[in-house]
């Protein structure tokens, strides 16, 4: 059986999805000869496959187009494991991500050895369905196979799987402490099939970024998505009015994003046409944004400065940068205003907020008492989650707290902001919207204040409910279920053939008394004996069963996962 391992691209696909560093993701090869029996249907289906692969190789921005073509081929043959695998991968990129599960399970059931990362991908698909216990099982199975078979080129997946396992455990806790907030995508024409994010409410107008475009519009070389454009919309009586694209003087081939008001005339913008990406000041002249000077006290030559927020007082500015010396990929920094014309040097906000992973964006409340940011660290339940912390009396920011479910999801949740009427906005890549990132909004819930007799009622600041990261009672049942579901079985394979073997031929190979199990996988009839809980036990029986070329195979739930060549350290 010929197998093509396409590991590296898939790993980095899910690590770097939002960083713009993706290159060369590859799919599994779908053979024309084995695709379908009918000649005319075979040609048509394979034409869809070839076109899908060609588009996919351009960049992840074309993944939705590739997915549609793969699905057209799937209608002509729904049992090809490589095709089902490729459809699953495209769903994990283009969404809805939970739709990937059935295709990946189908691929794995037909060919358990379809790909070295199949259980990692199945784990992701379960995770996006909020089925965290089954996701953990498959992430652990992925680790087990890497360790068992000593796949050196896949060692990078071990810490990534551990990270996903921890996120799934966080997710179970957060789901168990979910709030009653009902979230809906913002109404009107704001959201589209493309990415919409970074909602900023200035005066009476909602500004937001979108990567929508027409087929012939220019695309970013990083990911082959359309460049970010700035739009605005005014709210009518019952819904948002038609959107309007904001013009600027930087040209078309640039990402352009508005963040915060700097002073009475100028606003803080991000532009990708300077270095790795810098923050600029700009002001509106008639119907066009005129880009001014780069913010020199923030920008560095070799780093990317993105996301900025300024409280109403104007005496601080918070921003995100990937400059050297931080705790992780991107950290949150701040500068203080020292005079009308001078700002302090950037200071890292510290290790209680920044993590070894990635902080993506930042927002400070108008009164400067609350900080919101997205992070892949802390107790995130998947990708970026949104966190908040309060400024203490001594001016230091308190411990970050996860905003909880349903504000956060198992997908990426980013770019939180608030307006002056007590409504919060954020962008999420979760399913249920129009596609990609969609913008959601909801009224900030009023705090519940209990009446205390004979004592004054204290005014509590308006906050969004937060969720504690600890809840032992919720974790107990899923943990037991997790232990049950991750049960592995080792067997000894004594023979394999393309055709069903005669009993006498099997007896000539194996003369012992163990029951022989017959399994048909990917065109091969495989014969195994024994059920052992550890590799050591199985290997001992393999060496004593009398079949010289016997070997140990790992099973889970009746499925053959692959060869087991050496003991797993956990045993």
Predicted regions and their residues:
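Short, conserved micro-motifs composed of acidic
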Residues: 27-47, 86, 93, 114, ...
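Alpha-helical segment of the N-proximal tetratricopeptide repeat
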Residues: 38-76, 492
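TPR-repeat structural position
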Residues: 61-63, 97, 132
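Canonical positions in the second alpha-helix
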Residues: 73, 106-108, 142
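Structural marker of alpha-solenoid helical repeat scaffolds
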Residues: 76, 110-111, 145
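Extracytoplasmic
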Residues: 485-487, 498-571
């Amino acid at each position: 059986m010929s197998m093509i391992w396409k590991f590296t691209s898939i790993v980095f696909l899910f690590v770097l999805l939002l960083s713009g560093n993706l290159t060369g993701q590859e799919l599994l090869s779908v053979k024309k000869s084995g695709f379908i029996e009918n000649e005319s249907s075979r040609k048509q289906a394979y034409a869809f496959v070839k076109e899908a692969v060609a588009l996919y190789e351009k960049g992840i921005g074309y993944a939705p187009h590739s997915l549609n073509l793969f699905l057209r081929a799937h209608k002509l043959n729904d049992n090809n494991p490589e095709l089902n695998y490729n459809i699953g991968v495209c769903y994990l990129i283009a969404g809805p991500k939970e739709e990937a599960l059935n295709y990946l399970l189908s691929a794995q059931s037909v060919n358990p050895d379809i790909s070295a990362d199949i259980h990692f991908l199945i784990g992701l698909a379960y995770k996006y369905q909020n089925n965290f216990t089954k996701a953990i099982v498959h992430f652990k199975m992925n680790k087990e196979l890497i360790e068992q078979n000593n796949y050196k080129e896949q060692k990078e997946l071990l810490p990534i799987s551990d990270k996903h396992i921890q996120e799934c455990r966080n997710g179970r806790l957060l789901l168990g402490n979910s709030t009653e907030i009902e979230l809906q995508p913002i109404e009107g024409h704001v959201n589209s099939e493309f990415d919409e994010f970074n909602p900023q409410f200035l005066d009476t107008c909602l500004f937001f970024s979108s990567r929508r475009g027409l087929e012939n519009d220019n695309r970013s070389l990083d990911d082959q998505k359309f460049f970010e454009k700035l739009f605005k919309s005014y709210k009518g009586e019952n819904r948002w009015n038609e959107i309007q694209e904001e013009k600027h003087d930087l040209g078309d081939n640039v990402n352009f994003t508005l963040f915060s008001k700097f002073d009475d005339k100028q606003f803080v913008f991000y532009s990708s046409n300077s270095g790795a990406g810098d923050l600029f000041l700009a002001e509106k002249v008639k119907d066009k944004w005129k880009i001014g000077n780069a913010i020199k006290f923030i920008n560095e030559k070799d780093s990317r400065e993105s996301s900025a927020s300024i409280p109403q007082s104007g005496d601080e500015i918070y921003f995100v940068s990937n400059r050297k010396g931080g705790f992780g990929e991107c950290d949150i920094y701040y500068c203080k205003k020292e005079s009308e014309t001078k700002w302090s040097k950037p200071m890292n906000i510290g290790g209680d907020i920044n993590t070894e992973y990635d902080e993506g964006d930042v927002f400070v409340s108008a009164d400067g008492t609350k900080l919101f940011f997205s992070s892949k660290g802390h107790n995130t339940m998947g990708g970026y989650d949104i966190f908040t912390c309060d400024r203490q009396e001594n001016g230091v920011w308190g411990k970050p707290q996860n905003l909880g479910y349903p504000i956060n999801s198992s997908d990426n949740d980013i770019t939180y902001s608030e307006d002056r009427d007590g409504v919060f906005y954020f962008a999420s890549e979760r399913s249920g919207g129009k596609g990609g990132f969609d913008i959601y909004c909801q009224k900030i819930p009023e705090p519940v204040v209990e009446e205390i007799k004979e004592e004054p009622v204290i005014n509590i600041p308006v906050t969004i409910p937060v969720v504690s990261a600890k809840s032992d009672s919720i974790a107990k049942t899923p943990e037991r279920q997790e232990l049950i579901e991750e049960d592995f079985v080792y067997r000894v394979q004594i023979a394999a053939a393309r055709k069903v073997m005669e009993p006498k031929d099997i007896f000539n190979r194996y003369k012992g008394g163990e029951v022989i199990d017959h399994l048909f996988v990917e065109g091969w009839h495989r014969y195994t004996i024994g059920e052992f809980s550890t590799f050591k036990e199985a290997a001992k029986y393999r060496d004593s069963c009398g079949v010289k070329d016997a070997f140990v195979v790992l099973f889970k739930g009746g499925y053959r996962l692959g060869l087991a060549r050496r003991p797993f350290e956990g045993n």
